[in-house]
Amino acid sequence: MSKNTVSSARFRKVDVDEYDENKFVDEEDGGDGQAGPDEGEVDSCLRQGNMTAALQAALKNPPINTKSQAVKDRAGSIVLKVLISFKANDIEKAVQSLDKNGVDLLMKYIYKGFESPSDNSSAMLLQWHEKALAAGGVGSIVRVLTARKTV
């Protein structure tokens, strides 16, 4: 009986953690090329008064896969600057111009803005949140709050 167990001990060589999807793997940072949105492009769109293009430029190239908190903070401040510069009447049109992933990304930045409120940012972010919720639904909030990769 023991001879049979010793000879067929292959089951002990299986690494069960290899198949666990929740296993933490400290991989190399794949987002070294992700420097966040281009601040010059965003500023030029803001100066020209093209707010929707400024929002699109600010949401382009998000630093999701980078571990550098400085890059994430810089991208967050750029997006927050764009969101605050919108007029209340233009918010809904801008949110409607985004696709589903864009609305989810916008929600991530809105919640990041809620983390560190400034002078007038909370009131504007609440307006943005209302319009983004109308466009993306409750699922957008759930996807943001359960996402592992943050902005």
Swiss-Prot record:
It is linked to Immunodeficiency 113 with autoimmunity and autoinflammation: An autosomal recessive immunologic disorder characterized by recurrent and severe infections, early-onset autoimmunity, inflammation, and facial dysmorphism. Features of autoimmunity and autoinflammation include hemolytic anemia, thrombocytopenia, hepatosplenomegaly, leukocytosis, neutrophilia, and elevated acute phase reactants. GO terms for molecular function: actin binding; structural constituent of cytoskeleton. It comes from the Eukaryota. Gene3D superfamilies: Actin-related protein 2/3 complex subunit 5 (1.25.40.190). GO terms for biological process: actin cytoskeleton organization; Arp2/3 complex-mediated actin nucleation; cell migration; regulation of actin filament polymerization. The modification N-acetylserine is found at S2. The gene is ARPC5. This is Actin-related protein 2/3 complex subunit 5. Residues 21-44 are annotated as: Disordered.
